[in-house]
Amino acid sequence: MAVAYPTDKHVVHEETGKGLEVYSIWTAISNGKMPSNKQLRGLGSSLTDGAKSVAKERQKKISDPARKFFSDFSKLIDNSFNVFAKKNEGDLLQNAIYELSQAEGSTNVNEVWNDITEDMQSQDFSTEDLKQLFLLIFNNGKLRTLLQNAIVLLGQQTTNVASKKLNEQDGKKSDNLRNGVNKVKQNMRNGASARDQAREQGSKAKDKIKNDPDAQKAKEETKQKLQDLYEEFKSVAVDLQGDPKYQHPVRSLLNLIDKFIDKLSEQSGNVTADTNEHYDRAMQYLKQLVENILNRSLDNLIDTLKQVQHDAENDEELKDWLESTRQFVRKVLLKKGYAKSDASDKEFNKLRDKGDELLNGRYKKRWQQLSSEVKKISDSASSDKDVKQLFSNYKNIYGDLIKREGGQISLKTSMCLEILRLGVPVILEKMQYFPIPRLEIEQPDFDVVLENLNLQTANVLPKLAEFRNNNFVRFSPYANITSFRENMINVHLSNIQCDLKDVNYYIKRKQGFPTFTDLGVVDLLIGKQGMVVNLTLSSFSNTMFENELPDSFFKVEDVKVDIHHIKLKIRKSRHRLLLAFLKPSLMTYVRSTVARSMELSIRHAFEQVDREWYEIHKEAKSEIEKDSSKPTEDQESKLKVYGRVAYSRISNLHKSSKEKGKDSQVRVALHKENTALNNIVLPSGNLQRSEEKRRAALSGSTWHSPAFNIFGVDDSEDSDSPWATDRGSRLYQRTKGSVKSRESRLKKEKHKNRPASKGTYTTYTSSEERQRSTEDPLSHDTLSRTILNDQIVKGNVTEIPLPPLAVNEKRASVAVSSIPSFGDDQHDIELLNSTDPRKNRILYNQPPAVA
């Protein structure tokens, strides 16, 4: 056997369709499409089934900790999607994100202080801000602690702390008070003297509460907790100011709060807000989503805030205090250096004393009402059993993968390697083929276009990997002998195979002799030992004991690629005789060219990884050094810092690669819009199929897309699409049936599609075409046929008359974009791409099909 897994033409069409569906999903997401709750539930079922299948199929090779991980992972996925579907009932989050993306209005805030006027103008709360705020809450543990402490402190104000402390005193004081109350009740029957005695007893009780030391102690404790909360707030503000990517989301959130307050007051003060219907609908969706998460309506809280705003409109003192508090929060969060200044502490103390006077004075009842509502919401959210179970599952996964040693957090390396060893084969089994619809290579000497490249994942990956590590250390106590250390790693990868069938190619040699243009179909086989890669990496230091980081982690010393067995079979070509004569030298050229290009690609990839890895390490180490001055409990773990820095670096790299990819000499075109050499048309099926799925992925209304029907059909959208098959909600469920049954169906379809009579071309309605494509994935029509069928359904075209055929004359379909022959007819490429009817008539050697 030449390769480990030979290409099976009977299943390659179906398997490559899975890869094209992945491309279409990426296209849909890139264009703002999102899966619905039902579609996400199908994805969750697929992930759960995959995790269970790994544990089931590898029973003899799996350890108990790994089995526990896959079990916990299945439970986490199930509970996550169930909680999400329950809280997000009605696709609230998707609707909110879509409305935010469609909003044209902006939330503009006037100048609140002169230092940051320009920065506060035209801040839009967008979907990117929503994502960054979510990441901020997820990554910043101090912010989560701050929110929790604020809610707890606010909830403590629902009842009179001093009264609680008084009721918790010893039995003697309680009995005295109870006896006093009973005595008052008994004497109430005695008329005016009893009422006077009751007043006297009541005033004594009030004096006890007022002068009680426990009440004063509780008040001081509350004041101290508020001071601690402010210190935590300053610490969070300093962290946010040190990360530029959070500045815009924080400003946008503050503007959103200003806008909300402006709506409560029903009039504009110093803040003006511009809005539109999309923005208002987005806020309604988000409000409903928050209520579902908290398990309680926010209407009472909003009504209370409206009453507070109404009080502020009628009380200048309260209004000034609220406005000063808002401006103070802005300064601390946005003005660099202000949080650490003495001016901020003085202003905080001033605002705290004034607030204590107002909230514990004439607005005490309103403040208790607000605190009570916040506590009810907090209690309702914390008592959610589903969320508690979800956090329990998350802790189990965290414990399976993370270990704590010496106060530091690190990954369980052996566990992660075992998960990869067990999971990767299952993933490769599910995705056997990796399609590349079109590959374009532009060089000064030649242009090459390849289509219908269906790579087998099991063949492309090396079957054997070897690593060898060599260490060399030299040191001496004498100054004239330089200490030296070097580490060298040798990597050997072999049995990298490839079996490509029916590859459509176009090649044009622009310089040298001879210049020629050719196109055709070729089979490429790299088998047996296949491609062998030998890579040598080294890391060295000129000094034995150096503390500073080197410029890089490793250096690529040598890359050697050998291709031991390559076979090229040219099935169709415009220059068959010439290629047959030049085949020996051509094989040598192809082998050396492929090996050289692979060497350059591997070297470039490792050098880029080294640069990015070094920058990530350098930035993370700098942040860790800054955190070292903080208390131990406030320091972030190294794993978390590295993960956050790596995520930010990879995101920036992805954006820059998009811009550079447009001018790259080697391009992978997923659909027609990505092609640069669009004047070159090859008879490949993958590019047309990818284009169909791309158009269908963008065809859904608003944020819906039929591309996500691969997970599960969305009832809210028309499931009449290329994804509406009988596969159900499983991602990798395969079509049943043997090769014989598939071939017999193909023969029946071929007989069925014959023209009904001379001079006519039989077509089918769109529903019939979809039924045929569902019955067998191989019976695939191109984009031109789809467009033609749509016109027939609309009634624009009923029958296409064709002139009668001559004797022994063959007719070529005009509904299929294909080139009939490469070997018999030596046509020029310009003729193949021409839209001139006369040239097309020459090409097909027949009259035009449509007059």
Swiss-Prot record:
Palmitoylated. Coiled coil: none annotated. InterPro entries: HAM1-like_C, HAM1-like_N. Keywords: Lipoprotein, Palmitate. Pfam families: HAM1_C (PF14613), HAM1_N (PF19343). Residues 165-223, 714-781 are annotated as: Disordered. This is Putative cell signaling protein. Residues 165-176, 196-223, 767-781 have a biased composition (Basic and acidic residues).
